[in-house]
Amino acid sequence: MTTNYIFVTGGVVSSLGKGIAAASLAAILEARGLNVTIMKLDPYINVDPGTMSPTQHGEVFVTEDGAETDLDLGHYERFIRTKMSRRNNFTTGRIYSDVLRKERRGDYLGATIQVIPHITNAIKERIIEGGEGHDVVLVEIGGTVGDIESLPFLEAIRQMAVQVGREHTLFMHLTLVPYLAAAGEVKTKPTQHSVKELLSIGIQPDVLICRSDRTVPANERAKIALFCNVPEKAVISLKDIDSIYKIPSLLKSQGLDDYICKRFSLNCPEANLSEWEQVVYEEANPGGEVTIGMVGKYVALPDAYKSVIEALKHGGLKNRLTVNIKLIDSQDVETRGVEVLKDLDAILIPGGFGYRGVEGKIMAANYARENNVPYLGICLGMQVALMEFARNVAGMEGANSTEFVPDCKYPVVALITEWRDENGNVEVRDEASDLGGTMRVGGQQCHLTEGSLVRQMYGEQTIIERHRHRYEVNNMLLKQIEAAGLRVAGLSADRKLVEIVELPDHPWFVACQFHPEFTSTPRDGHPLFAGFVKAAGAYQKRQVK
């Protein structure tokens, strides 16, 4: 099988939506029966995003095989059926780390290690490895053309076009075409200069995606084509749109997939986008709306909870409800009290790290439990629900996590000290262990308790969900908590770790140690989020009565 490569770059400004554009194109190609995957190459020097601040970088998306990756991989999985893995995302830091390790080992036989050829060769090797077994691999280059950090990646893909052959490579460049109200027209000069920048490093774009707040007129697209040396049919207008799920149809309507298939000599049927049309229809025709409060630590940057926000929307699609998400800083709950939680139809507490705002989350869990408000706790959201229940129901005054209070009387959440790595080797960790790459992370099997609410929602006895945490329920104190009425609804494969808890005497109170948001998609949704949004709608109706 010959793999075809589409290299996606961005110019003029950042945040043009390269990831969404790449994922949308991948969705069309997949709908044509092609085996497609997507890669994200990040130019920062961190080895991975695992220890980066969520308020700077956004969420860390966890893959099935346990890689901590860029949030764009979440977009990729929500748009195509192919599951991402650690092969789909790497950084400058990872490349340099690998090359330096080989140099120390003597693999280069004493050669002088340089950006060209050693770094660029390592980049090319990883791209080829990531694309193995696929008809088409889209490779998104992070950053903006002209950034110093991106140069080794751009040089690597330039070389790949020569080595793999232009018949199997295509350069797709996203660029900004701004509208100037004073002139009453769109301006193409920024695009021309962005392409000029690409040409200066030896890359001639084959497709231009013109981002604008409006449709770029045909005469302006013709002008761009002429001055940028690109066929007119390969200059695509991508205007701002009210739903990202309309983008596959928008790109297809301009013949982008036909152009690419012809370029790669791929003989495949027309794309059937009926699934995406159904998603757009459900989104545009809700039967009502609910308001869900998300109580978190990183609400200043909604991208820190990108997958949770999208999963809530997917839950809304499955219930024909618009989900209005109210982001609430957990510290506001501490200072202003539970008044900030009034008028919500449900409460969700997502994952997080560190003690700041934890007491506010505990107050929110308490409010949901005592007022029969539907509650979904994820990761830390489960741990705070457990601490709240232990304190106020099970009689464990001051119950806490050893993450926050190491010497507390009732450590209902504690650090797991023994882990097994992907090779089955036991690793011992403590509070002094490195933060990066030292968590229980990736897909883990979970056995659901017969008769539980989650068993009913999933419709399966055994599930696989993705984790990212260091702390777990302390089994030494579990029996006392269960005796007070909390039900363990899911256990790990070895039956040693608590994965899900729920309250049988509450209309809908579920908390899980894993991150269900990472496996939710607009086409399929997710059982927990669908059930949670449904419960929010039921709560709203009860309040009206």
Curated annotation (Swiss-Prot):
Entries under CDD domains matching the protein: CTPS_N, GATase1_CTP_Synthase
GO molecular function: ATP binding; CTP synthase activity; glutaminase activity; identical protein binding; metal ion binding
Enzyme Commission number: 6.3.4.2
Keyword Ligase (UniProt): yes
Alphabetically ordered keywords of this record: ATP-binding, Glutamine amidotransferase, Ligase, Magnesium, Metal-binding, Nucleotide-binding, Pyrimidine biosynthesis
Residues annotated as catalytic: C379, H515, E517
Pfam families referenced in this protein's UniProt entry, alphabetically: CTP_synth_N, GATase
Family: Belongs to the CTP synthase family.
Known function: Catalyzes the ATP-dependent amination of UTP to CTP with either L-glutamine or ammonia as the source of nitrogen. Regulates intracellular CTP levels through interactions with the four ribonucleotide triphosphates.
Protein name: CTP synthase
